[in-house]
């Protein structure tokens, strides 16, 4: 009699629930997963190697393209590592702006995550709600940087410029009539801070709508509860960070344990799960959005009262203000040298990590004293989480693999890099 062999199934890379270009080779016994083998590298763009041929500032836009839904958090880790090597301090206002945009980015990431996760599981409506809120936050990105996604707003030493005192207005066009444009501009008459404050006041109402749709939904709970359980011990052994670790009951958050920027002056709670399953990870990320909303409110209140510089005044690191550069020969020379030759960073090595929406995102630099990094290494949280997919999927059905991938919140820009 012939041996019974397990069935092998290719999941992706074109599958909509694969969250990018994941190719997952599943070994199945009927519909039960015996082994899950992730194949990565389909989005590899050699970011670490490219950084070796670019100046320290030129590599900032590459960071946006790693995890392309958590753009400014990637930039933050890069700038922190560069500043550590340079031994410079960011002005206080620059720190608060960074914290505020880190949290805007966290909400942006979690909105996309819950919209797509629900869509994968079969709850179609969620994505329509979350993309409505993402639009407002992307307008804030656009107001400060000119780009909706790849902002390149952070710089070694601070941020590119201070917050604008007026929001861009919608204009009448082929797609938007005068009435529609006026409706969209209702809360855009003030500054970026006014617009963002209005959003933070509205967001808890939207958030409660998400809870109404999903949290006690019988089908949602059946699909998530006791699926992809990770014990606290295993989560630590596998190197999980972020919501993947906190969902298993371990209160590890770099913003609390190793504060950077202005997080040591901000009040917020770290939500943790109990059971370590997909449902707990969902609840942790949902609560994180509310905590981020509160952090943004605190930053807005501080920024209103404390004007000041947003980037270091060391012209060997940051360019002088444009108006000075046009009237002062010395500052023109600084500007010219910075944009032709770049910063010369002292020889040494440094590692800096931030509490990224997906976990601990770290940048490790080795500098040989030149105007380019000798070596850059990216510590991507999603890479570690994807490595745990095999263990998390075993014994579950094929449909549960979709749930587990969704609860990991993986993006291939940072995994393949």
Swiss-Prot record:
The keyword Translocase applies. It is an enzyme of class 7 (translocase). It comes from the Bacteria. Keywords: Cell inner membrane, Cell membrane, Membrane, NAD, Quinone, Translocase, Transport, Ubiquinone. GO terms for molecular function: NAD binding; NADH:ubiquinone reductase (non-electrogenic) activity; quinone binding. Belongs to the complex I 49 kDa subunit family. NDH-1 shuttles electrons from NADH, via FMN and iron-sulfur (Fe-S) centers, to quinones in the respiratory chain. The immediate electron acceptor for the enzyme in this species is believed to be ubiquinone. Couples the redox reaction to proton translocation (for every two electrons transferred, four hydrogen ions are translocated across the cytoplasmic membrane), and thus conserves the redox energy in a proton gradient. This is NADH-quinone oxidoreductase subunit D. It comes from Dechloromonas aromatica (strain RCB). The gene is nuoD.
């Amino acid at each position: 009699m012939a041996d019974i062999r397990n069935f092998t199934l290719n999941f992706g890379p074109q599958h909509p629930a694969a969250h990018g270009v994941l190719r997952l080779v599943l070994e199945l016994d009927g519909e039960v997963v015996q082994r899950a083998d992730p194949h990565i590298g389909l989005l590899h763009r050699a970011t670490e190697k490219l950084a070796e041929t670019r100046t320290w500032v030129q590599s900032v836009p590459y960071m946006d393209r790693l995890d392309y839904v958590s753009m400014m958090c990637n930039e933050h880790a890069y700038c922190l590592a560069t500043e550590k090597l340079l031994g410079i301090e960011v002005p206080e206002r620059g720190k608060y702006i960074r914290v505020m945009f880190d949290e805007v980015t966290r909400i942006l990431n979690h909105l996309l995550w819950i919209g797509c996760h629900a869509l994968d599981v079969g709850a179609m409506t969620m994505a329509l709600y979350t993309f409505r809120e993402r639009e407002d936050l992307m307008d804030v990105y656009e107001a400060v940087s000119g780009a909706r996604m790849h902002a390149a707003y952070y710089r070694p030493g601070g941020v590119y410029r201070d917050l604008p005192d007026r929001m861009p207005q919608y204009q009448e066009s082929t797609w938007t009539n005068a009435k529609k444009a006026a409706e969209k501009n209702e809360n855009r008459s003030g500054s970026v801070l006014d617009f963002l404050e209005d959003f933070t006041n509205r967001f808890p109402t939207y958030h409660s709508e998400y809870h109404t749709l999903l949290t006690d939904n019988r089908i949602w709970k059946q699909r998530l509860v006791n699926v992809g359980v990770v014990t606290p011990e295993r989560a630590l052994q596998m190197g999980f960070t972020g919501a993947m670790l906190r969902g298993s009951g371990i209160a590890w958050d770099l913003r609390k344990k190793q504060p950077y920027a202005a997080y040591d002056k901000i009040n917020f709670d770290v939500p943790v799960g109990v059971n370590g399953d997909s449902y707990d990870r969902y609840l942790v990320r949902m609560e994180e959005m509310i905590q981020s909303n509160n952090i943004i409110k605190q930053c807005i209140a501080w920024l209103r009262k404390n004007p000041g510089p947003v980037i270091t005044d060391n012209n060997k690191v940051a360019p002088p203000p444009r108006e000075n550069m046009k009237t002062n020969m010395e500052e023109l020379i600084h500007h010219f040298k910075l944009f032709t030759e770049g910063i010369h960073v002292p020889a040494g090595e440094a590692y800096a990590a931030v509490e990224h929406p997906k976990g601990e995102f770290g940048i490790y630099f080795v500098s040989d004293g030149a105007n380019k990094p000798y070596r850059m290494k990216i510590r991507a949280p999603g890479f570690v989480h994807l490595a745990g997919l095999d263990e998390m999927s075993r014994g579950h059905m094929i449909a549960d693999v979709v749930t587990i991938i969704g609860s990991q919140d993986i993006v291939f820009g940072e995994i393949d890099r």
